[in-house]
């Protein structure tokens, strides 16, 4: 019997960020919108900047298997996350990597690797809002 059009396919999606996670949420939602009757169960882990914070997220991922999307600049945390996901059989996607690699190649400039770099509140920011 065919699946009813109003029944959704539910799946867990885990988003791990060393900043607010806003970028991950937007990318994930834009991607999910391309699939009919797909309903993500969203798990956001924001401001993950220590091994202990990552460990807590990984415990949750193990309890609720699903797709893992991340934006982490810390190489050690990235490696730990990728290794853990591989051992659990979970797909892990570094969302910004292809974009940053392309821009770096085109511009001939290295990626700075600063967590939350787009949301820096500096003197220029405060001058603009005055």
Predicted regions and their residues:
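Short helix-loop-beta junction
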Residues: 30-39
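Non-catalytic terminal and connector segments of soluble metabolic enzymes
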Residues: 1-3, 7, 38-39, 78, ...
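Metallocofactor- and cofactor-centric catalytic cores in central/energy metabolism, strongly enriched
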Residues: 44-85
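Short N-terminal or domain-adjacent regulatory/targeting segments
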Residues: 1-7, 50-53, 119-130
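N-terminal accessory targeting/assembly segments
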Residues: 1-31
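N-terminal loops that bind phosphate or other acidic moieties
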Residues: 19-20, 35, 49-50
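Short, surface-exposed connector motifs at secondary-structure boundaries
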Residues: 9-12, 38-40, 61-67
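Ser/Thr/Gly-rich flexible loops in soluble cytosolic domains mediating phosphotransfer, phosphorylation
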Residues: 14, 86-130
